[in-house]
Amino acid sequence: MQIEISANSRKLHGTGANRRLRSQGRLPGVIYGGNGDAQSIELDHKDLYYKLKMEAFHASILSISIDGKKEQVLLRDVQMHPFKQQVLHIDFQRVRQDQKIHVKVPLHFINADIAPGVKLSGGMISHVATEIEISCLPKDLPEFITVDLSGMTAGSTLHLSDLILSENVEIPALLKGDNLPVATLIAKRGEAGESSEE
C-alpha cells in the first residue's frame, strides 16, 4: 500500500512567511528533481509529523498530491526543531520509473534467539548497522531488508555480502569493494574461564 500525502503550492517565501505558516499548523517544504522545476509546497504539520513516525515513510516511494496533481516522490530531508516536537522543513525528490534511485533502507533482524552463539554459548548480538544504502529502480524498492541471524556462532560477523537481496537491488558499497559488517555475535565474557573451573 502506497503512502499518500496531500500538499498545496506555496506562494510566499522567507523566514517570516514560514513562521506564519507554522503558526497556522502548516509545514513548508520543497519538491525537486525528475523532469520538473523545484516547487515550494506546504503541508499539514500534524499529518506529516505522524507519518514521519512510520518506518516505511522513510524508505518508500510516496504519492504526493499537489493541488490535486499526483507525483511519485522520495523523502530526502527533514529539518526538526532542536527541542520542540516540530518539523521545520521537509524535502521530497521526484522519481522517474526508468531511473535508478539511491535510498537508505532499514534492516530487520530476525532469529537472534535461535542463533547457536546466543542459544548455546550465551553470546550477544551487536547490530553494527541498522540501515544500508541500496540502488534500484523505484518499482524494485524494498521497504526493508531482512537479516537472518540464525546461523551466527560466537565471534562470527555478518557482512553486506551475506545479505539476501531481491533481484535488481544492488548495494553501492559492495560495488566499491567495501564489504562492511552488519552484525557481530560477541562471545560471553569469561565463558572459557567458567567452563574450565567446572
From Swiss-Prot:
The record's Pfam families line, in alphabetical order, gives: Ribosomal_L25p, Ribosomal_TL5_C
Q: GO molecular function: any one?
A: 5S rRNA binding
**Top-level lineage group:** Bacteria
> What are the recorded Gene Ontology BP terms?
translation
Gene Ontology cellular component terms for the protein in this record = cytosolic large ribosomal subunit
**Entry keywords, A to Z:** Ribonucleoprotein, Ribosomal protein, RNA-binding, rRNA-binding
Which residue windows are transmembrane per the record?
A: none
Q: Which family does it belong to?
A: Belongs to the bacterial ribosomal protein bL25 family. CTC subfamily.
Q: Which NCBIfam families match?
A: bL25_bact_ctc, PRK05618.1-2, PRK05618.1-5, PRK05943.1
Q: How does it assemble?
A: Part of the 50S ribosomal subunit; part of the 5S rRNA/L5/L18/L25 subcomplex. Contacts the 5S rRNA. Binds to the 5S rRNA independently of L5 and L18.
Functional summary from the UniProt entry: This is one of the proteins that binds to the 5S RNA in the ribosome where it forms part of the central protuberance.
Protein name in UniProt = Large ribosomal subunit protein bL25
What species is this protein from? Answer: Nitrosomonas europaea (strain ATCC 19718 / CIP 103999 / KCTC 2705 / NBRC 14298)
Gene that encodes the chain: rplY
